[in-house]
């Protein structure tokens, strides 16, 4: 099926002005540097989104100014020449066939993103010239996207058949193929580690312009995506989509091995490492590997001895915030989860589940070396040190090493009785 040609509008070119937001000189002066940087990033991203539709869009003066690292033109574009973007210029486009099909949503987002920069502005529509912004049910706040369906309903993307013949951009590192050269360049940054987009506020670097745009919202305080159910706001649409599944209960990502379902793909990926045994995050200090980056981060603290999360009530410190939150329930609330067998109560469901295995005799964690099974993963980990000879707990007084924390605590009690603290000094 042949691709449908773009809407005629007297066969005129779709210009950048059709989706541009302009500022007066006074409005521009009121923007702080980080807002100007966000405006620049969004304008470039918007222009490239239109280019991705495959239409011969002229290159306006405002884009030329940005490319030269200059200030943007303030009101209007002062007679931009109608010339197409040269094919030799590499654009940083997030373009896939499926996203081309969603071009209407992309152009609607152009107006939504720009609406947060300045309260007074002109909005160029796709159906005519400049018109003042009107408050409608779909545009009451800057957090709601404007409805531009009327001017967009005729616009169509090139057919997939026309696009597939261009899928000849292959990564030399991993063999993955892409539909355009710019997508290949962006992908290759995952191998090279290149991050060409710097935040002017804090200096943090990013590999994608869209990631920089999202990050800049942290500095401006903008959270444009709001949950209708609870009012919580997010910096990007994907985070809002994942959050809304908490309210709907939808878990579209299912594990093929055990059938467990998850709200997002990243949680499924982390879970699947339990089945595959993959541990991609390795400690450079001791060589120990972990399935999740957060676990490695927490593990690194055991080498420094630093426990950054301290309880305000009793002063006890912890390596992770989840451990602190679990501990603080001791001070603030009663244990809610009670064992029906023995009456013992717990603060969280996972602790109760672990405890109930004592009564059921369930031992799902089996040692690969000797076949011995355990009811808890931590007990299996402790047991495996018998085979590996690992002794990660070292006494700060005498240097003796132990395979379990309980053993070193028992050992250090001897020094406590002698009046020697854990640092080795007399109290």
Curated annotation (Swiss-Prot):
InterPro entries: KRAB, KRAB_dom_sf, Znf_C2H2-type, Znf_C2H2_sf, Znf_C2H2_type. Keywords: DNA-binding, Metal-binding, Nucleus, Repeat, Transcription, Transcription regulation, Zinc, Zinc-finger. Residues 14-85 form the KRAB domain. It comes from the Eukaryota. SUPFAM superfamilies: beta-beta-alpha zinc fingers, KRAB domain (Kruppel-associated box). Its main location: nucleus. SMART domains: KRAB, ZnF_C2H2. A zinc finger (C2H2-type) spans 169-191, 197-219, 225-247, 253-275, 281-303, 309-331, 337-359, 365-387, 393-415. Residues 111-142 are annotated as: Disordered. GO terms for molecular function: DNA binding; zinc ion binding. It is found in: Nucleus. Belongs to the krueppel C2H2-type zinc-finger protein family. May be involved in transcriptional regulation. This is Zinc finger protein 2.
């Amino acid at each position: 099926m042949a691709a449908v040609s773009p809407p005629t509008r007297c066969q005129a070119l779709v210009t950048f002005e059709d989706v541009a937001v302009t500022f007066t000189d006074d409005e521009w002066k009121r923007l702080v540097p980080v807002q100007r940087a966000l405006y620049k990033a969004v304008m470039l991203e918007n222009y490239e989104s239109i280019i991705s539709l495959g239409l011969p869009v002229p290159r306006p003066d405002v884009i030329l100014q940005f490319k030269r690292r200059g200030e943007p033109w303030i009101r209007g574009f002062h007679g931009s020449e109608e010339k197409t973007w040269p094919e030799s210029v590499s654009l940083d486009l997030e373009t896939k066939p499926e996203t081309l099909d969603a071009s209407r949503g992309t152009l609607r987002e152009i107006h939504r993103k720009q609406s947060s920069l300045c309260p007074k502005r002109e909005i160029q529509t796709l159906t005519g010239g400049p018109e003042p912004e009107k408050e409608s049910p779909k545009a009451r706040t800057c957090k709601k996207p404007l409805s531009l369906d009327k001017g967009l309903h005729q616009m169509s993307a090139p057919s997939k058949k026309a696009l597939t013949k261009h899928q000849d951009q292959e990564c030399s590192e991993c063999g993955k193929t892409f539909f355009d050269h710019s997508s290949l360049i962006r992908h290759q940054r995952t191998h090279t580690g290149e991050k060409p987009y710097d935040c002017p506020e804090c200096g943090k670097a990013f590999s994608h312009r869209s990631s920089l745009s999202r990050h800049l919202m942290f500095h401006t305080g903008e959270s444009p995506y709001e949950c209708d159910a609870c009012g919580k706001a997010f910096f990007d649409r994907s985070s809002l989509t994942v959050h809304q599944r908490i309210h709907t209960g939808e878990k579209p990502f299912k594990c093929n091995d055990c059938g467990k379902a998850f709200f997002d793909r990243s949680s499924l990926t982390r879970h699947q490492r339990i089945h595959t045994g993959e541990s991609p995050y390795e400690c450079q200090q001791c060589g120990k590997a972990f399935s999740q980056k957060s676990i490695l981060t927490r593990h690194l603290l055991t080498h420094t001895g630093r426990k950054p999360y301290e309880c305000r009530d009793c002063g006890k410190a912890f390596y992770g915030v989840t451990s602190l939150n679990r501990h603080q329930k001791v001070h603030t609330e009663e244990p809610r989860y009670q064992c029906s067998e023995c009456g013992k109560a717990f603060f969280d469901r996972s602790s109760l589940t672990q405890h109930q295995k004592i009564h059921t005799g369930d031992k799902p964690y089996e040692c690969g070396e000797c076949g011995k099974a355990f009811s808890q993963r931590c007990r299996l980990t402790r047991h495996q040190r018998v085979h590996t000879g690992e002794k990660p707990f070292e006494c700060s007084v005498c240097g003796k090493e132990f395979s379990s924390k309980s053993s070193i605590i028992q050992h250090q009690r001897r020094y406590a009785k002698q009046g020697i603290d854990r640092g080795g000094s007399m109290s």
